[in-house]
Amino acid sequence: MAMYEFCGTFSVFRPSPVVEALLESIDSSDLLPRSFGWRRVKSSSGRKTDLWRREPLIELGELGQFADAMKSERGGRRFARAAKRVTGVTASPFEVQASMLFSTQRCKGGEGFSGLANNERIPLSASARRIYGKSTCYADLLFDVPNGASPLIVECQGKVVHDDYDSAISDSDRTTALQQMGFTVMPLTYRQISDQANFDTVRRMVARQIGVAYRSKSPKEIRCEIDLRRNIFIDWTTLGR
């Protein structure tokens, strides 16, 4: 999870009251440029959140090179295995959790779905641009489906930035534009993955869309899934403690 955050375009940071007051003072006095590197995410209602946008701290390729160089050190092989499980550049804890649930091997508690990439850039066709009003969009989770079937895009609908009317309209236009280009788009909410019963329905839907015959998990795989879920559905501000 830490590797995803290092390679991602987000950080989770909850300022103390003292730091919060200092940030407000700096913001109101314009002491720092608006693009100083970190940008705080606000909800559609203007509420400040603990989610921040920034450039990746380390590139995926750099992580892989470091992991290879550390293999001979204590814990190095385990570190290298973990690095290989990072599916791409994510933009939120929600995307990390969904990616880990879908891509982690079944023997490690996940679904073992292959062909998953994160935040893939998709240039829009002329007709799709007319619908969405933009020339490019990014797929939260993109499954490359074999045999010429429609690629599956799973869109993580986080409540922070998707909880008002304007966001709903924008999401709808974006979905329509992608569907016009032949993509299958599946909206995903946090509740659908955090609730295990709901997620059972979701994973079967994803399996069907990517052409995988879903096989029910063995008792051992179920225990591994419980362990995985316990480890990833945490207060992200406590990660690494």
How would you describe each model-predicted region?
Residues M1-F66:
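Nuclease-adjacent, charged terminal/linker segments that flank catalytic cores
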Residues G46, D50-R241:
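Surface segments flanking catalytic/ligand-binding clefts of nucleic-acid enzymes
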